[in-house]
Design a protein with these regions (language model features):
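Helix-enriched interaction subdomains in cytosolic or periplasmic regions
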Residues: 1-11
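Gly/His-enriched, cation/cofactor- and phosphate-binding structural elements
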Residues: 11-31, 35, 45, 58, ...
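Anionic-ligand anchoring segments at beta-strand to alpha-helix junctions in alpha/beta enzyme folds, i.e.
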Residues: 27-93
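Divalent metal-coordination and catalytic microenvironments
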Residues: 38, 48, 76, 126, ...
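Hydrophobic/aromatic beta-strand patches that form the interior of the parallel beta-sheet core
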Residues: 62, 99, 121-125, 137-140, ...
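Active-site cofactor/cluster-binding pocket
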Residues: 77, 82-137
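Short alpha-helices
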Residues: 127-199, 326, 333, 350, ...
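Glycine-rich, Lys/Arg-enriched anion-binding loops that position phosphate/diphosphate groups
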Residues: 170, 181-282
Length: 369
């Protein structure tokens, strides 16, 4: 528990969290982050792990999928953040509760695993729109650029007192700084609260470690997907639309980076990149939406284009103008040979483009790119 003087200065969510953690003193918790976690979720989970130690709570961080962004891989390795990738041999029976960070249950397969193991959810802390999907003891769902902002606020309020002489605290501050940097697209979309958080963290973070994380280059796979997006893109009324075929589920981050890249092209205000993600026999059409147009609402655009009941739209961070989306592939899912897969992709590619063209209000004839 935080010291009495610090507790007396607390109010709001940090005081409520202090009370909840105090009531679970001595327990073992599983921290759950999204299946394909980004630096924001990783940094926040790492910070929660350190805060938990103040209450004699041991906590392990779990994810289901894969970390494939070069910066995120370096973040984990350089800062010695221990993450456990789920496998069927893992046994959750020794855990007293679960903590969901950077997800409210819809972006992690582990929610069902924990439910089957009768592990009760204790906390949900996230910066996305409230989904009311998990029934937990404590919620802190804020409209913020990142979950790292929320955890920085906890640190400022005294849930963990950072010390410059503590190497682990230095790594924690560095991780949170990068989480904020990533979610604000290197501060392009940063607001006052982001700069205030960074100003606080800069007193403890290691700038040389941060520089090494930031300067990681794109992987060959990401470059291949960007090249495919450039080759297949269709530009209509300042919208750049590209389908990049089939990808493994763990390579989904390449879709986001390709959309970021297309948005840098001259006279393009909106980029939409999509692919069919394969994970065994399960397939889903996954896409990324980026726009610089202030009057364009990403949620409304996508739901009106594809149908409100047909698509899941989620906030990817970086700005209010960035979204990810998924459309399930049901009985057509699964591989059926090269010819079958080629035909299936053509059908989905044509259908997605047609719906987007209809929403934009243009014909489907290809423009010169």
């Amino acid at each position: 528990m935080a010291s009495r003087s610090i507790v007396n200065s607390m109010n709001g969510k940090e005081l409520e969290l202090d009370k909840v953690l105090s009531s679970h003193r001595g327990e073992k918790h599983g921290i759950i982050i999204p299946d394909f976690p980004d630096s924001d979720a990783i940094a926040s989970a790492f910070t929660h792990q350190l805060i938990s130690l103040q209450y004699n709570i041991s906590a392990d961080i779990f994810y289901w999928g894969k970390i494939n962004n070069p910066q995120d891989i370096v973040l984990v390795k350089l800062l010695d953040i221990e993450l456990i990738r789920y496998s069927e041999t893992l046994d959750f029976s020794g855990y007293d509760g679960s903590v969901f960070i950077g997800t409210q249950g819809t972006t992690t397969t582990l929610r069902q695993v924990l439910e089957a193991s009768n592990i009760k959810p204790i906390l949900v802390i996230d910066h996305h729109e409230e989904e009311d999907f998990i029934h937990a003891e404590f919620y802190d769902i804020r409209k913020a650029s990142s979950t790292s902002i929320i955890y920085t606020d906890y640190l400022k309020k005294g849930l963990l007192k950072l010390e410059r002489s503590n190497p682990t605290h230095i790594k924690c501050a560095t991780a949170l700084m990068y989480g904020i940097m990533y979610k604000t697209d290197r501060y392009i979309w940063a607001k006052e609260e982001d700069f205030q958080a960074v100003a606080f963290l800069s007193n403890y973070a290691d700038s040389s470690l941060l520089e090494e994380i930031v300067n990681q280059s794109r992987s060959k796979k990401v470059m291949d997907v960007i090249q495919k997006a450039l080759e297949s893109r269709v530009i209509k009324q300042n919208y750049s639309i590209a389908g990049v075929g089939y990808l493994r589920a763990e390579d989904r981050n390449a879709i986001h980076q390709a959309a970021d890249f297309l948005l840098t092209e001259e006279n393009v205000h909106t980029a939409i990149v999509y692919a069919i993600l394969q994970n065994g026999n399960r397939e889903v059409l996954s896409g990324s939406f980026r726009t610089r147009k202030l009057t364009l609402d990403p949620d409304e655009f996508l739901r009106e284009a594809f149908g409100r009941g047909e698509i899941e739209v989620y906030y990817e961070g970086k700005s209010q103008k960035v979204r990810g989306f998924e459309i399930p592939i049901f009985f057509l899912a699964g591989t059926g040979g090269e010819e079958y897969n080629t035909l299936k992709w053509r059908v989905y590619d044509m259908q997605v483009k047609q719906k987007l063209f209809n929403k934009i209000g243009v014909s489907e004839e290809r423009e010169e790119t």
